[in-house]
């Protein structure tokens, strides 16, 4: 019987498939799906509950209501399988066919499909080249359209109103035909010759010169081509037959009380059938035209509502006033088919419960309540009971389990042994949100979680819940164990740092254990080893913190794995010596011979992992945790109010600050400072006071005076509980202690501006009512922010995953020589991120040479690991080219060499690793930690005064980069170029500092001069931009007429006069076209030339420039001719945090972007218009390029200056699109990576650059064809980059001309929608638009990405699935050639080995 059922089930097995194609269905196709026509709108008989014949639930069409039983009951049981009952016409089969048998409705008049009509751009409108409004008028019976002009002067597809039509009828009679409604459109579409249209448009493209026309024609041509290639017939966009959904997918269920609950679709179908039947009857009766027309219009509207309710006109509403859910609504949105049922499903064998701590567990274990385990492992228990012969049937086994007999618990123990379970905590923001553990049965009802995995789950025990899932098959258990076990996930995939790091209590315990104290019992003892140290401590002969000498044995393991031991006496403490007992062999003692804070412990685990491998590290981590908990308990650290010591200096500091504020207030009242300055100064005073109080408080807390053995007083670190917690990194920070014992300081209003009266009290002293009220402001804003942040961050992650989901490592090496240049991140005087940290885990793209020589230090294609990093440090390498995902040459996905090290595993990435999803998770997961707000500059944020000099922080050599300068009479260098940089390098040639040099800076050091730390290297004026002469001579003013182009002012106090150039807009008419300038002449009055050029030294003065020198004065080289006051920089809001990251990945253009030079050449200015300046760049070839620039933009270039392509002409935030166009892929990658990192670094979040590069690769996956060559592409068409690459490769192989193209940068939302796979795009956003487009162009989805495969229910082509898919393709290739003798054994171990090389 069982076999028979299985056989029946197997009958409808579909063959394996490799791609899914979507297209338009022809009427015949719809009829071929159908099992009969639905003729009546009836559903079921309300008395008998039987479906009506020919109705929407008809059993004859859709199949029986009960398994193997016809409707009238004549045939029952399996033996009549396949019989069709002659009485009621129902086939005897399973009920479930009612889920897949469709019906159809023959429409009495054709109806346009609303998706192809209204989904923009309207496909029908575009194809026929008629505006949508006109087509709608025809469809909804307001106008006639000419379908056959005959011998008349009418044109085909010309619109006629009712009157015009009647006039023409009188004139021509039946010479011509004009119709209205969908039949007219159908006729027109049917009479179109696609090939002829395409030919005609191609000719049009070649002859036309207008850009708009070309764009329009290209669009239409693409659509026509799509129809030709896909074999879709345009007529099929008009429906003549309507398919009917299987009834079980639109159920009708009787509720008690004689009412029915029904799917909205049934209502919509009933409307269509009613109107269709009425129309048929009207046509039979030959009713008047106007009635028929009205009925046809209503039919069109009802079909529209069925397909996509609310797309046109008002949505049809049901009885309860809400719009009915149409077919389109069923699939789109969060509750639609895609996101609700296909991408995320609920699963059996899962449970959830509250979590509590399991401090005694091992890292790979979790505590599972017995009750839960019994329920989850039921099937396993049943089968065990049966095989043991303890229960005869499954039913008996069930009874035994329900009675909870003693034997059941023994069997549960056996079943659970080494059967991992998955624990998941929502929200699962990265892959460590689901990990596998071995269950340990416990009493109680809460799941116990190992404390060290809390960081990965971001879990705490304040009532969090977690879900448990049971992997059922052997394969699933194997994967859970080898890939998902918590012991295999020690490193974070985002940064490669350990994520199993002790926190809180454990840190505090270890910190307390490794601190030292002066002059306590046992100080100065000599001990023979850690064991004796422990003995001394246990017998109370020495205290835990006593400074002692201990004999220590270290093990050193060299690269070949040979170990040598070394014994020495070490100055240490009892606690550290005891801790040494649990440290595995192979680590140096120095690593624990220090006070261990959170950072040091993390480093300790990292070292252990890199040197000793996974197994030892895991055991060590557990030991650390047990030890930490034990000593945290022994330490007795607690928080008491007396631990918060308020520094006595606080009160004097506050008094002084109040005095200063009073002075400023007086200055303001007497008009010496403006309101804004007063506000900023007051805030500065309070900010610095707060810092000083905090310093005094920390100094007070952090040290105490004790008497040492010699009776002298000595300072030692304090054992104050609060200080210890903050210092160890267990809990709290200096900023929080400052609020407890210093002063709370300045508070912000919800809009981000700072309230100028600070809270001078702290929590120990207590706040008064006003202070309390002020502080609630910020706190409430914080909570509101958090809620918004979570949603925003989640949406960002979703977009990132969607754009990157199909990046999988597909091959070992793509063979490219490309790469990106790596340099250390240097800001001002600090190396923010060292080169070794950036290059770690990357593969070298070009041989790295030993600095200053031609010797190869690191050969090409080397994976940089910790050993190489050390070599780089020793040889002071300061730049290198590494391979990157962005430049990877693989056609699909990327290759292992370009990706480099798998951060979570520490070796070269495996093929099949889903690096795209990991990148998206790594960027999205910390999203909730980023801030939401735009920072307003004001108050504390602008405490840094405007920079006006560079002071060297390191000793070394000065280097100038792309700097032009002149030497003035004081022998100082004056910079006359824009994007100059000054760097200071150390004796090894490593860059230590990097500074921007503004135009007009005075340098006291030249190129290659030595400099010592603390010297001022350059200075400039902060608030003005000078104009500097590059030649000496006499001044002559040009066009500088007082009262017209300049206004003179004389200072009353000094008697000095200066002229200010008036803004062109504010000049009288006479001065509009004048261009005030200063020119330099020699003694004879001839123009002086700028050295090295043929250009006279003319300096044009922009509006607002101030000139302090007189006409005819003598000037020397490097003197300042005029000053342009700069708007004090940076009162713009800086977008920070999450919105900034989103802007970068969406590649949004900034409001006023920087203007970059489009070409290399010499700058001059042409004729100005009302609001714009004309910038002209003359290239070396003499070709000029012009660009209009708004007058209010501050330009960085002067007449006659030379610029390089991509140089900044006007300041502002740079647009990534411009960077890509002018400076290329590398520059844009670097820009996005640096800007994103900036935001994350501010929050102290570490993310590896390769994740950001992976996303950038996906943003760059489209390109625009500029020249088609011999390819199939159209110029101006946007094509997938990989497609162009493949096409060009084939063209080059045939010796034809390849297509030329420009890379495009798309934002992540756009890039997700522009993906090759329509299934993936449709499940992301704008489902209707995506599906319409895909259907018209007959798209084929090759199921390459992960998402498409999840949706169609196959193994994903990543991880173990990658090997499976490769295997399948190989087998199919074989099968096509002819079956080979030995069929490859599809064995799981082979798959696992092929897909993964785990460390274990």
Swiss-Prot record:
Keywords: DNA-directed RNA polymerase, Magnesium, Metal-binding, Nucleotidyltransferase, Transcription, Transferase, Zinc. Transmembrane segments: none annotated. GO terms for biological process: DNA-templated transcription. Zn(2+) 1 binds at residues 70, 72, 85, 88. It catalyses: RNA(n) + a ribonucleoside 5'-triphosphate = RNA(n+1) + diphosphate. Coiled coil: none annotated. It comes from the Bacteria. Zn(2+) 2 binds at residues 814, 888, 895, 898. The RNAP catalytic core consists of 2 alpha, 1 beta, 1 beta' and 1 omega subunit. When a sigma factor is associated with the core the holoenzyme is formed, which can initiate transcription. This is DNA-directed RNA polymerase subunit beta'. It comes from Vibrio campbellii (strain ATCC BAA-1116). The gene is rpoC.
């Amino acid at each position: 019987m069982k076999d028979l059922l299985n056989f029946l089930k197997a009958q409808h097995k579909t063959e394996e498939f490799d791609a899914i194609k979507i297209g338009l269905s022809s009427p015949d196709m719809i009829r071929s799906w159908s099992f009969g026509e639905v003729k009546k709108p009836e559903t079921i008989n309300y008395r008998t509950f039987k479906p009506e014949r020919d109705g929407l639930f008809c059993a004859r069409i859709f199949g029986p209501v009960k398994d193997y039983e016809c409707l009238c009951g004549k045939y029952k049981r399996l033996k009549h399988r396949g019989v069709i009952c002659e009485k009621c016409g129902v086939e005897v089969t399973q009920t479930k066919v009612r889920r897949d048998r469709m019906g159809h409705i023959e429409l009495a008049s054709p109806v346009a499909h609303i998706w192809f009509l209204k989904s923009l751009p309207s496909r029908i409108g575009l194809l026929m080249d008629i505006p949508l409004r006109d087509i709608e008028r025809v469809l909804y019976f307001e106008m006639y359209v000419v379908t056959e002009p005959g011998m008349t002067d009418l044109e085909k597809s010309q619109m006629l109103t009712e009157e015009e039509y009647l006039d023409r009828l009188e004139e021509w009679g039946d010479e011509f035909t004009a119709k209205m409604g969908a039949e007219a459109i159908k006729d027109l579409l049917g009479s179109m010759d696609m090939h002829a249209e395409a030919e005609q448009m191609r000719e049009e493209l070649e002859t036309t010169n207008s850009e708009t026309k070309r764009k329009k024609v290209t669009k239409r041509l693409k659509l026509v081509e799509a129809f030709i290639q896909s074999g879709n017939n345009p007529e099929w966009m008009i429906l003549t037959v309507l398919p009917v959904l299987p009834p079980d997918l639109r159920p009708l269920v009787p509720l008690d009380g004689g009412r029915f609950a029904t799917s909205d679709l049934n209502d919509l179908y009933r409307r269509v059938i009613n109107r269709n039947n009425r129309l048929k009857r009207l046509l039979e009766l030959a009713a008047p035209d106007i009635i028929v027309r009205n009925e046809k219009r209503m039919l069109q509207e009802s079909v529209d509502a069925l397909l996509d309710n609310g797309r046109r006109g008002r949505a049809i509403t049901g009885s309860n006033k809400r719009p009915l859910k149409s077919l389109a609504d069923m699939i789109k949105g969060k509750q639609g088919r895609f996101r609700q049922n296909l991408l995320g499903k609920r699963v059996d064998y899962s449970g959830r419960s509250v979590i509590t701590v399991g401090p005694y567990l091992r890292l790979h274990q979790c505590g599972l309540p017995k009750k839960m385990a019994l329920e989850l492992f039921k099937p396993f228990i049943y089968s065990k009971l049966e095989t043991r012969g303890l229960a005869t049937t499954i039913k008996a086994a069930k009874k035994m389990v329900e009675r909870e007999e003693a034997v059941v618990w023994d069997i549960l123990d056996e079943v659970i042994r080494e059967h991992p379970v998955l624990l998941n905590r929502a929200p699962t923001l990265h892959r460590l949100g689901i990990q596998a553990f071995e269950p340990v049965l416990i009493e109680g009802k809460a799941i116990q979680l190992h404390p060290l995995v809390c960081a990965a789950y971001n879990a705490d025990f304040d009532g969090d819940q977690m879900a448990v899932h049971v992997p059922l098959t052997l394969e699933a258990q194997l994967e859970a164990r080898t890939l998902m076990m918590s012991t295999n996930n020690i490193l974070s995939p985002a940064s490669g740092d350990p994520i199993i790091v002790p926190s809180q209590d454990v840190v505090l315990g270890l910190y307390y254990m490794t601190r030292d104290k002066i002059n306590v019992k046992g100080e100065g003892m000599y001990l023979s080893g850690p064991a004796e140290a422990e003995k001394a401590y246990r017998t109370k002969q020495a205290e835990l913190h006593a400074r002692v000498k201990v004999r220590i044995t270290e093990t050193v393991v060299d690269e070949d794995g040979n170990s040598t031991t070394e014994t020495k006496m070490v100055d240490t403490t009892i606690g550290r010596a005891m801790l040494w007992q649990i440290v595995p062999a192979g680590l140096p003692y120095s690593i624990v011979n220090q006070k261990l804070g959170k950072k040091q412990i993390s480093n300790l685990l990292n070292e252990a992992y890199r040197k000793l491998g996974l197994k030892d590290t895991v055991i060590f981590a557990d030991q650390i945790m047990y030890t930490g908990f034990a000593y945290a308990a022994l330490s007795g650290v607690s928080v008491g109010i007396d631990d918060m010591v308020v520094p006595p200096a606080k009160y004097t500091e506050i008094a002084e600050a109040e005095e200063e504020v009073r002075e400023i207030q007086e200055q303001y009242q007497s008009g010496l400072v403006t309101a804004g300055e007063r506000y900023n100064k007051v805030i500065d005073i309070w900010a610095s006071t707060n810092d000083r109080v905090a310093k005094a408080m920390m100094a007070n807390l952090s040290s105490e005076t004790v008497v040492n053995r010699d009776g002298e007083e000595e300072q030692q670190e304090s054992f104050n509980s609060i200080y210890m917690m903050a210092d160890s990194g267990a809990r709290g920070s200096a900023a929080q202690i400052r609020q407890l014992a210093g002063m709370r300081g300045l508070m912000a209003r919800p809009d981000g501006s700072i309230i100028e009266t600070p809270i001078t009290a702290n929590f120990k002293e207590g706040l008064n009512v006003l202070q309390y009220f002020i502080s609630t402001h910020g706190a409430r804003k914080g909570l509101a922010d958090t809620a918004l942040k979570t949603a925003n961050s989640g949406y960002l992650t979703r977009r990132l995953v969607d754009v990157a989901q199909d990046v999988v490592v597909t091959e070992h090496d793509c063979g490219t020589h490309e790469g990106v240049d790596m340099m250390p991140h240097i800001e001002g005087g600090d190396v923010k991120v060292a080169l070794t940290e950036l290059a770690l885990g990357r593969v070298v793209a070009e041989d790295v040479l030993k600095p200053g020589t031609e010797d190869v230090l690191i050969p090409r294609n080397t994976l940089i690991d910790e050993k190489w990093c050390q070599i780089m440090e020793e040889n002071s390498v300061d730049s290198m080219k590494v391979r990157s995902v962005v430049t990877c040459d693989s056609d699909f996905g990327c290759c292992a060499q370009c990706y480099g090290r798998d951060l979570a595993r520490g070796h070269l990435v495996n093929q099949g690793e889903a690096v795209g999803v990991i990148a998206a998770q790594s960027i999205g997961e910390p999203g909730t930690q980023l801030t939401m707000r735009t920072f307003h500059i004001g108050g504390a944020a602008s405490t840094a005064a405007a920079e006006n000099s560079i002071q060297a922080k390191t000793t070394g050599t000065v280097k100038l980069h792309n700097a032009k300068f002149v030497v003035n009479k004081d022998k100082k260098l004056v910079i006359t170029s824009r994007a100059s940089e000054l760097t200071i390098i150390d004796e090894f040639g490593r860059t230590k500092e990097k500074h921007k040099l503004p135009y007009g800076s005075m340098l006291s050091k030249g190129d290659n001069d030595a400099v010592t730390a603390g010297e001022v290297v350059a200075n400039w004026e902060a608030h003005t931009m000078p104009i500097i002469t590059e030649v000496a001579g006499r001044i002559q003013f040009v066009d500088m007429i007082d009262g017209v182009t300049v206004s003179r002012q004389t200072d009353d106090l000094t008697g000095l006069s200066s002229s200010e150039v008036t803004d062109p807009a504010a000049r009288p008419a006479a001065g509009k076209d004048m261009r005030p300038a200063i020119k330099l002449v020699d003694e004879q009055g001839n123009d002086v030339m700028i050295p090295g050029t043929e250009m006279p030294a003319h300096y044009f003065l922009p509006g607002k420039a101030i000139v302090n020198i007189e006409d005819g004065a003598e000037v020397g080289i490097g003197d300042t001719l005029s000053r342009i006051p700069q708007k004090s920089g940076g009162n713009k809001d800086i977008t920070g945090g999450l919105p900034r990251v989103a802007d970068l990945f969406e590649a949004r253009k900034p409001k006023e972007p920087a203007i970059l030079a489009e070409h290399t050449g010499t700058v001059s200015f042409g004729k100005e218009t009302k609001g714009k300046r004309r910038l002209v760049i003359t290239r070396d070839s003499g070709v000029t390029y012009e660009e209009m620039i708004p007058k209010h933009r501050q330009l960085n270039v002067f007449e006659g200056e030379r610029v390089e392509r991509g140089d900044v002409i006007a300041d502002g935030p740079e647009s990534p699109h411009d960077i890509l166009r002018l400076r290329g892929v590398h520059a844009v990658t670097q820009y996005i990576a640096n800007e994103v990192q900036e935001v994350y670094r501010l929050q102290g979040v570490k993310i590896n650059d390769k994740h950001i590069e992976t996303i950038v690769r996906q943003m760059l996956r489209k390109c625009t064809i500029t020249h088609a060559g011999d390819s199939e592409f159209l110029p101006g068409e946007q094509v997938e980059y990989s497609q162009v690459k493949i096409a060009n490769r084939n063209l080059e192989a045939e010796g034809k001309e390849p297509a030329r193209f420009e890379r495009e940068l798309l934002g992540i939302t756009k890039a997700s929608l522009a993906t090759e796979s329509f299934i993936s795009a449709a499940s992301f956003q704008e489902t209707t638009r995506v599906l319409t487009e895909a259907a018209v162009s007959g798209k084929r989805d090759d199921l390459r990405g992960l998402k498409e495969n999840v949706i169609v229910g196959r193994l994903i082509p990543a991880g173990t699935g990658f090997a499976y898919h490769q295997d399948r393709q190989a087998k199919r290739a074989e099968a096509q050639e002819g079956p080979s003798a030995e069929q490859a054994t599809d064995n799981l171990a082979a798959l696992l080995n092929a897909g993964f090389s785990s460390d274990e």
